[in-house]
């Protein structure tokens, strides 16, 4: 380790101990080395013993800086690894940091564009509109049209910081695996590998631009959701240019009401947007916290959501959607056995799981929720309770479903903040029933047939050749089968002959032994020689 890495490692360790995070690792679970290290740092005490452990964990990560904040945010989605009281606190982490020098941002943009900003933009504001740990946003206008745009640029100094802290995370993860046996099941090195990939992906704004363009296409012309246009010609790996929007932040209830917004419709549209993304598009914005969601102020009676920052998205395949739909319908029909069986059939819990025990565990946590009126039930908390229960049965949580559950909690929270009487079930049920109807029955058969029609239309002219090839291959196969069968019969005959010769030889050898005991040596010798000859012939027969 370099001196700077040792200094940083000491600072990380000091912060962790000052927040009492050594409580995460019970002393009985430690080997001798970490016990001695803890005693060696005796002067570092827990400064906040009155605060809950989850809150202390969140505060420590905030103090350690952007890389650790984002690590905590990612860990908040891994409810297969962390108990609820820790995961809930990690979900509260906010990625807010002081802006960096606007001139540095401008220099970085010009390097990405290959020339002065004046070649493409006017009215560039050197003061940032927003700032986060990975990127910063500035405003300007397009020179040729005067259109207002925003420029999102990656911090020029962030990669060395990320790489340095990631190296330390790997060292710490390996030490944890080596010296804390109980922590090995959490696979800390694999967790860091996953985080490194996620973080490095965020350094490439082309990925976010692609996500935004996909979401915009999906809701083209929609009254429910608007996604700002990306100016792709001016965007690159470390710079994304998109249209500037003006809206009311969705959490600003006072301003929304002052603008005369139809709060009931706005809340219902939030739920509708979510389920449309999931069941129609299989592609959803997975970071819909209040900072990324605005409301178009132009038509308050017909309010439209505006979605920003598409850096994190989720995708679902047919199996994922079927799992979600059948589970939710199973829950609302109180069919917990079906829910438990679905998990076993999908392979998300081990095949030897006791379905009755799993059903009972699900019933225990979900019955209190479903005792409420349907309008008060939280879908997000239903899935959350399901994940926490399945975790006890060694369920391997699917990342895309965890993202979906987190997004659903955001949408529900916003919806009920806007309109407390929001009945999510009334809004969601048509989506679930319509999607399920398309998956089973005649409609599903017709849909599947129409999806395969282009393939069969392409293959139809080849059908005669395919039939001829199949018949020819069948004839060749029959000939080979006849040869194999003839060989098999010949082999069986040889084996029978060999067995017969072996038995005769064995009989003659036994006779020679009897004759020898009676002192009839000549006959005994002839019998032994003949028996040996028969054995030799039997061996040759077997060899064939």
Curated annotation (Swiss-Prot):
ATP binds at residues 129-137, 152. Pathway: Cofactor biosynthesis; ubiquinone biosynthesis [regulation]. GO terms for molecular function: ATP binding; protein kinase activity. It is a single-pass membrane protein. One of its GO terms (biological process) is regulation of ubiquinone biosynthetic process. InterPro entries: ABC1_dom, Kinase-like_dom_sf, UbiB, UbiB_bact, UbiB_kinase. Pfam families: ABC1. It comes from the Bacteria. Keywords: ATP-binding, Cell inner membrane, Cell membrane, Kinase, Membrane, Nucleotide-binding, Transferase, Transmembrane, Transmembrane helix, Ubiquinone biosynthesis. The active site is at 287 (proton acceptor). The chain crosses the membrane at residues 515-537. Its EC number is 2.7.-.-. The keyword Iron does not apply. It is an enzyme of class 2 (transferase). Residues 123-501 form the Protein kinase domain. One of its GO terms (cellular component) is plasma membrane. It is found in: Cell inner membrane. Is probably a protein kinase regulator of UbiI activity which is involved in aerobic coenzyme Q (ubiquinone) biosynthesis. PANTHER family: CHAPERONE-ACTIVITY OF BC1 COMPLEX CABC1 -RELATED, PROTEIN ACTIVITY OF BC1 COMPLEX KINASE 7, CHLOROPLASTIC. This is Probable protein kinase UbiB. It comes from Aliivibrio fischeri (strain MJ11). The lineage of its organism: Bacteria, Pseudomonadati, Pseudomonadota, Gammaproteobacteria, Vibrionales.
């Amino acid at each position: 380790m370099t001196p700077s890495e040792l200094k940083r490692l000491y600072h990380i360790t000091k912060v962790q101990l000052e927040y009492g995070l050594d409580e995460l690792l019970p002393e009985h679970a430690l080997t001798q080395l970490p016990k001695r290290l803890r005693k060696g740092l005796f002067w570092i005490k827990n400064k906040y013993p009155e605060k809950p452990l989850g809150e202390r964990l969140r505060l420590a990560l905030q103090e350690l800086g952007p890389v650790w904040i984002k690590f905590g945010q990612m860990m908040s989605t891994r409810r297969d690894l962390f108990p609820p009281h820790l995961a809930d606190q990690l979900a509260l982490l906010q990625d807010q940091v002081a802006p960096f020098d606007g001139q540095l941002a401008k220099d970085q943009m010009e390097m990405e564009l290959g020339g002065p900003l004046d070649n493409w933009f006017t009215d560039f504001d050197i003061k940032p509109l927003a700032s986060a740990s990975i990127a910063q946003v500035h405003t300007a206008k397009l020179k040729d049209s005067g259109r207002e745009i925003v420029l999102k640029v990656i911090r020029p100094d962030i990669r060395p910081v990320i790489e340095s802290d990631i190296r330390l995370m790997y060292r710490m993860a390996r030490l944890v695996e080596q010296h804390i046996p109980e922590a090995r099941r959490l696979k800390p090195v694999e967790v860091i590998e996953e985080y490194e990939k996620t973080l490095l992906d965020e350094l490439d704004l082309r990925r976010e631009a692609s996500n935004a363009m996909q979401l915009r296409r999906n809701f083209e012309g929609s009254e429910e959701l608007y996604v700002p246009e990306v100016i792709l010609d001016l965007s690159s790996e470390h710079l994304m240019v998109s249209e500037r929007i003006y809206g009311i932040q969705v959490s600003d209830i006072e301003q929304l009401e002052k603008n005369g917004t139809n709060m009931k419709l706005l809340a219902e549209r939030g739920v509708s947007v979510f389920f449309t993304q999931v069941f129609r598009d299989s592609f959803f914005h997975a970071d819909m916290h209040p900072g990324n969601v605005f409301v178009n102020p132009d038509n308050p009676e017909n309010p439209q959501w505006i979605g920003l920052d598409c850096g994190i998205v989720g995708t679902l395949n047919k199996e994922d959607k079927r799992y979600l739909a059948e589970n939710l319908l199973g829950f609302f029909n109180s069919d917990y056995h079906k829910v438990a069986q679905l998990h076993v059939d999908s392979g998300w819990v081990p095949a030897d799981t006791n379905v009755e025990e799993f059903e009972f565990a699900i019933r225990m946590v979900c019955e209190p929720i479903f005792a409420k009126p349907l309008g008060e039930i939280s879908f997000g908390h239903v899935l959350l309770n399901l994940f926490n229960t399945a975790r006890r049965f060694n369920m391997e949580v699917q990342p895309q479903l965890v993202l979906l559950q987190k997004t659903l909690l955001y949408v529900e929270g916003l919806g009920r903040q806007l309109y407390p009487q929001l009945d999510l079930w009334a809004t969601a049920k048509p989506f679930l029933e319509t999607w399920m109807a398309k998956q089973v029955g005649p409609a599903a058969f017709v849909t599947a047939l129409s999806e395969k029609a282009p393939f069969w239309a392409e293959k139809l002219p080849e059908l005669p050749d395919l039939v001829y090839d199949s018949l020819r291959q069948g004839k060749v196969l029959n000939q080979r089968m006849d040869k194999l069968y003839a060989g098999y019969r010949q082999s069986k005959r040889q084996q029978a002959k060999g067995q017969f010769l072996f038995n005769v030889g064995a009989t003659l050898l036994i006779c020679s032994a009897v004759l020898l005991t009676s002192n009839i040596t000549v006959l005994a010798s002839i019998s032994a020689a003949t028996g040996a000859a028969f054995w030799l012939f039997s061996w040759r027969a077997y060899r064939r």
